């Protein structure tokens, strides 16, 4: 089980990413476009650098939705490998069966 502070930090980062996503995308588009004036590009780089560090999606971590475990998360299910196995063996995941051949 992840510490509550880590889950709260992740939630705060998700909120910041969502809040600044449009502005960040617009600035990155300006920076990447080949026809952008160099002065405008430099200003866009400065504005991008002024955005909060935690508003970058790179700083998000995939976590288990139940207990917050940060590693071994199966993206398709949002569960860690440990939790996935437990729930699958108990029959709590529809359509998931243990392989047998």
UniProtKB/Swiss-Prot annotation:
Protein name: Small ribosomal subunit protein uS14A
Subunit structure: Part of the 30S ribosomal subunit. Contacts proteins S3 and S10.
NCBIfam families in the cross-refs: PRK08881.1
A Gene Ontology term for the protein's cellular component: small ribosomal subunit
Functional description taken from the UniProt entry: Binds 16S rRNA, required for the assembly of 30S particles and may also be responsible for determining the conformation of the 16S rRNA at the A site.
PANTHER family: 30S RIBOSOMAL PROTEIN S14, SMALL RIBOSOMAL SUBUNIT PROTEIN US14A
Keywords: Ribonucleoprotein, Ribosomal protein, RNA-binding, rRNA-binding
Naturally occurring in which organism (per UniProt): Salinispora tropica (strain ATCC BAA-916 / DSM 44818 / JCM 13857 / NBRC 105044 / CNB-440)
Keyword Ribonucleoprotein: yes
Chain's gene name: rpsN
Family statement drawn from the similarity comment of this UniProt entry: Belongs to the universal ribosomal protein uS14 family.
GO molecular function: rRNA binding; structural constituent of ribosome
InterPro entries xref list: Ribosomal_uS14 (IPR001209), Ribosomal_uS14_bac/plastid (IPR023036)
Lineage: Bacteria, Bacillati, Actinomycetota, Actinomycetes, Micromonosporales
One BP term from GO: translation
């Amino acid at each position: 089980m992840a510490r509550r502070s880590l889950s709260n930090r992740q939630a705060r980062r998700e909120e910041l990413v969502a809040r600044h996503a449009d502005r960040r995308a617009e600035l990155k588009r300006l920076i990447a476009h080949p026809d952008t004036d160099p002065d405008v590009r430099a200003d866009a780089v400065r504005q991008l650098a002024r955005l909060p560090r935690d508003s970058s999606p790179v700083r998000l971590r995939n976590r288990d939705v139940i207990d917050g475990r940060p590693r071994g998360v199966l993206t398709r299910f949002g569960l860690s490998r440990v939790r996935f196995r437990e729930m699958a063996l108990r029959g709590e995941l529809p359509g998931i069966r243990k392989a047998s051949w």
